[in-house]
Design a protein with these regions (language model features):
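Charged DNA-binding/catalytic regions of mobile-element recombinases
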Residues: 1-234
Length: 234
């Protein structure tokens, strides 16, 4: 291909996106590339798309086992179930960072927030190991079907710890409602309320907010007690 050298970044991005999202068609891939600033003209995307034979029918590989619907029960004790999820935001210099939020469903206590530019499965396991050392081992973890959560690394760690790893059904965020509701508050009250200069700045403000959330903020679902008060009253 005469334009191969100039097209290489687009080729790499198309291969990666197509591998991550095998059900995506041309237009969804094109708009993702355009959003990322790699292409503007759809004709260029289409030419590369066809050259890579991505327009040919493919057998979709089943990535995850079937998920079983599980009612969102109210735990009777602490460490019955922890919910995990990611959020993200940007620093003032435009770099995007992620947060891994870990919540105890029993008293809605925010056990920890891991923050970095990248949080692969290995960091998820490191974070959980640290939290287990401090809080004890949960009976179950509830997550969505993100790549970090369906990784063999996390599954093996949970098996070693005797923890049941429960994935919600795809497209059913209400099955992880505790952390979903928390994420809404976390974004409104913290992420959207501040301009972050650095990861150190994010970590400082998040830890201050976490302490206030756990010790000062009353929760209607907890009879207007704070998470710590609710756990101490049990």
């Amino acid at each position: 291909m005469a334009q191969g050298r100039n097209d290489e970044p687009v080729q790499q991005a198309l291969r990666a996106l197509s591998g991550q999202h095998p059900g995506w068609g041309f237009w969804k891939l094109h708009h993702r590339l355009r959003k990322n600033g790699l292409v503007i003209n759809h004709k260029r995307t289409l030419r590369i798309y066809r050259a890579l034979a991505l327009n040919l029918p493919r057998r979709l590989k089943k990535r995850v086992p079937a998920r079983v619907k599980q009612p969102l029960a109210v735990p009777a004790t602490a460490n019955s179930c922890w919910s995990l999820d990611f959020t993200s935001d940007v620093l003032t210099d435009g770099r995007r960072f992620r947060t891994l939020n870990v919540l105890d469903d029993y008293n809605r206590e925010l056990l920890g927030v891991e923050i970095d530019f990248s949080l692969p499965a290995s960091r998820v396991v490191q974070t959980l190991t640290r939290l287990v050392d401090y809080y004890g081992c949960p009976a179950q973890l509830r997550t969505d079907n993100g790549p970090e959560f369906i990784s063999a690394r996390l599954s093996e760690w949970c098996e070693q710890q005797g923890i049941t790893l429960h994935w919600i059904q795809p497209g059913k965020p209400t099955q992880n409602a505790y952390i979903e509701r928390f994420n809404g508050s976390f974004r409104r009250e913290l992420l959207d309320a501040h301009l972050f200069r650095s990861l150190a700045h994010v970590r400082q403000l998040v830890e201050e907010w976490r302490h206030d959330y756990n010790t000062q903020r009353p929760h209607q679902a907890l009879n207007f007690m704070t998470p710590i008060e609710f756990k101490q009253a049990a």
